[in-house]
């Protein structure tokens, strides 16, 4: 076979017959095996030192991926970082520097998804990082933010505003500390600087013009609106921070801050005299510094020359105003072009009105910053000189502005379209826009320029008056502007008729029902400010507004109606009433006198339902009441003894009434005392008893209940009060004791007291334990050698004394509530027996043991033993030795048939030691015993 034939044989094509399978090749791969899928949800890498997320990546791995060239990897790293930090928050503190440096670096990333993930991560981190922690790294954060705001890419600029929102919300003080750079960035976001040679010699106000970028996905007006909203927020934070700083330094009074509070110092002279209360008059006084000081060190960048003054400098503020005001006017003209202006009263569409609102907000905040620095009013004159003409021309030409509502009709979903239209119209507050404009304009006017500005001032006055009188519901922001404009109008035009018209319009709004708390609070502060301003004027130039007098006269009745339904508002009413009462306002005092019975009602009055601070102010108001009739004193007594007032406030009230009485020592004529002595003593006695006449009458019907202690030797039953009521009554009685002790002619005072006890308490069969103890206490305090005790009072005292002693000796160990009464009641019982030996003798004579049951006999024996052992009573027991011996003999006779118990043995022992063994005793007792 030739070579050619061999070659053809090697490459000969195999012919297949129909119906037969193709033979398998020698190197064919078998495919008859089965496969299973292997799923790897996590990587096998593990790190025992650092926590990892679900992908087993730790913080270092995720931060290293932030430098990857692929946008998807960086986005995944940011999402993984958020997941890791949410699971392990402690990582934030340990790696805060690295986290901030890497996250802020992607603010200018070219990929939108990466920037979105960075913003979301920053929004997650910001609430978890305190300002003190982030402050060392804030220059880096601010630098990246500034780079993003001035970037040439439109998307990066838009996302930078989202970052700014987060920083303004969480760290307003830190972000406003970089105001010099950021304010310039705001200007560059909406404008550009003209660089032509002809503008070199012009001022800086004419070198900036609004910029238009056709490549942006938003319209120029929409973009400017976004920037102006952020600029308004930034200036608001700057103004708030500057106001707080100046207030902490004491450079100006607190003015328009609704959250401003002033804390008064309450001095208890009794504690102060005993060195129990330290009075610190000044905030930073004393040896220890004030730990809540607002002082903070500023960060120095490049030495002292690098300190960011921002708008705190007058020159910097004027420079920024010169740049931004012309741009804001251009935005206004663009939103409301003069050539397309419609007649006054026609509406403006939604988006232009939003731009106008932000323009006015920014100007208003700049005016607020200027007022904080303008101590000599030079800046105010400069603002009026440069911008009043432009403002009148552009702003006041179509004043007031209204919103044009555009209803979008849809056939399929009519309800949805109407709802959508309502939402759009509600997003715009054209009333607030007009009020902001009015506030800006009236701030440029003063009394000296009133004739020049009378035309547009009259427009504003008319608008303000109509807004107040139309009865529309205003929110707190609208009302704050409205009242600010009204106050400024009253200052620059102090005309009585115009002022009265404005006050009357505000009072019309005040009389509306259902006003929310912030609105009612602002109205109260406004009227209070007017009243205080009028009071500061001399009597020669003082003008008493009739509307203001009517408002003051209605405050006590409002307080009585309001009660505890709104404690905050009630507190504000009380403060205003207290201020006017201290200044002896006749209308208010007359109204307060007429409403006093409702305010000081012991059941539902404001004095018992409000918090303790308000109760204290109401108690102090009692001092200013023109008269204190008997029915009012009766209610005040009930307030003291019911426990609705604390014991300290009740003591303060008793002290105030003493100062109003004729026993205070003031040298006034008798006609000046508008509280009779009889009513005053009635008040003291009612407070001393601790129970009203009706309650004592109701107690007489109680029998066989656990709270009533009944003995077989005393006609007086004892009602056991609760421990809280007992302690409160005891503390209040101390103040009554003090008031009675300082009254001269003690014997007459004692006669009045014992006659009251004989009239109202003697003859009762059920007496509260606190009442009996307090009666004993006041008798011990007042009794001296000049006092003569009534014969009708002695048996009552003896019966009450035995009932109290029986109660004290029968208290079981498990009754912890009554055990705390033991020392107080035992002390007054021993004192009354030591001071009045006749009471002791009457009590011993009432111990007829032959009428006593077997359960009460050991109590009598224990009582006699304790009386014998008590040293102050030993002399009196010797005097009544025969009577005591007879009682012991009767007890021994009754117990002769049984085994002698231990208590009886102890009684015989004490008698033999203290009576029989006395040097004067045995000879006298030998014939009897």
Curated annotation (Swiss-Prot):
The protein's UniProt keywords, in alphabetical order, are:
Cytoplasm, Nucleus, Phosphoprotein
Any keyword Cell cycle? Answer: no
Where is the protein situated, by its record's location annotation? Answer: Nucleus, Nucleoplasm; Cytoplasm; Nucleus, Nucleolus
Q: What are the ranges of the HEAT repeats?
A: 99-137
Q: Does the keyword Heme apply?
A: no
Name positions with the PTM Phosphothreonine: 29
The record's comment on protein family reads: Belongs to the IPI1/TEX10 family.
Name of the protein described by the UniProt record = Testis-expressed protein 10
